[in-house]
């Protein structure tokens, strides 16, 4: 499921489509985290985010962050979910209960929550090694130690060895929907959208990302497949805003027939060329239509 969260449209406004919910009522996200806040010793949980200023321990959950966006992974030996989103400093530490940060109420945000079978979650852990996330809460019960030695290393603050500076993994949701995960370490110094994802997926990409740091990367058409910056978003019912008010990070294929949609945690900013992060992509036509129709204006080459 994708969520598009906007801080600039009226509260209580939401439009539900298949796979996609456009919302402004932040408390809906609370329901996604009820399981996280009630974890036990038969589940493993990971949360990660940037700018961590507090350290906590002795809680049956693992929490970690990548370059720009927090993520949550919660699973048992049957299945679990991977929640990726662009909301800074969210979720909060478990003992604080559910808190939605004030910083997430002003700008647009996105979230992607996918349920996977346990075998797929083992693949996800391999992707996390390349992200080398900043873990701020971690729980890997002993029952998982044989399957997840790399996850235990991450929780302990050490970095497992990497075969390269980037990795791509095919994933399948519990219902059978196909996804492609792209992750890069800080050693892959390039724009992930232009230099890698667009070329692998063989599609020109229209990219929405946070470019308010003063060093935005321009639209790039130097390679066979291009990455072009979105500048204006048009939500359903005529809600429109400039990209400078949008903290989300996602892209869609320019050509409708390609049906590519990706949600990520990296901006097209110069500083993030040296950062770890990634994208989760799908060819689902319904999801693509929901995101592609949001593009009101982009900068070509």
Q: Model regions: which residues?
A:
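PLD/PLD-like phosphodiesterase catalytic module centered on the HKD motif
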Residues: 1-301
């Amino acid at each position: 499921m994708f969520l598009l969260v906007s801080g600039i449209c009226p509260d209580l406004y939401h439009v539900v489509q298949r796979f996609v919910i456009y919302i402004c009522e932040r408390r809906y996200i609370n329901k996604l985290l009820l399981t996280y806040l009630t974890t036990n010793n038969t589940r493993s949980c990971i949360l990660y985010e940037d700018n961590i200023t507090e350290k906590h321990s002795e809680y049956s959950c693992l929490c970690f962050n990548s370059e720009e966006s927090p993520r949550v992974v919660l699973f048992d030996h049957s299945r679990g979910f991977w929640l990726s989103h662009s909301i800074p400093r969210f979720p909060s530490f478990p003992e604080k209960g559910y808190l939605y940060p004030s910083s997430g109420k002003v700008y647009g945000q996105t979230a992607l929550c996918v349920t996977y079978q346990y075998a797929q979650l083992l693949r996800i852990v391999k992707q996390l090694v390349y992200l080398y996330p900043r873990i701020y809460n971690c729980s890997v019960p002993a029952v998982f130690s044989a399957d997840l030695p790399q996850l235990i290393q991450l929780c302990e603050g050490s970095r497992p060895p990497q075969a390269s500076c980037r990795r791509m993994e095919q994933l399948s949701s519990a219902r059978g929907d196909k996804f492609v995960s792209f992750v890069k370490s800080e050693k892959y110094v390039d724009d992930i959208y232009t230099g890698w994802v667009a070329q692998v997926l063989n599609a020109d990409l229209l990219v929405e990302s946070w470019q308010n740091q003063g060093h935005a990367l321009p639209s790039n058409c130097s390679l066979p497949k291009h990455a072009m910056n979105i500048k204006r978003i048009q939500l359903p019912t005529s809600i429109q805003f400039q990209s400078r008010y949008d903290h989300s990070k996602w892209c869609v294929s320019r050509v409708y027939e390609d049906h590519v949609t990706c949600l990520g945690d990296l901006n097209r900013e110069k500083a993030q060329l040296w950062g770890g992060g990634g994208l989760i992509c799908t060819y689902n036509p319904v999801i693509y239509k929901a995101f592609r129709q949001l593009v009101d204006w982009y900068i070509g080459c």
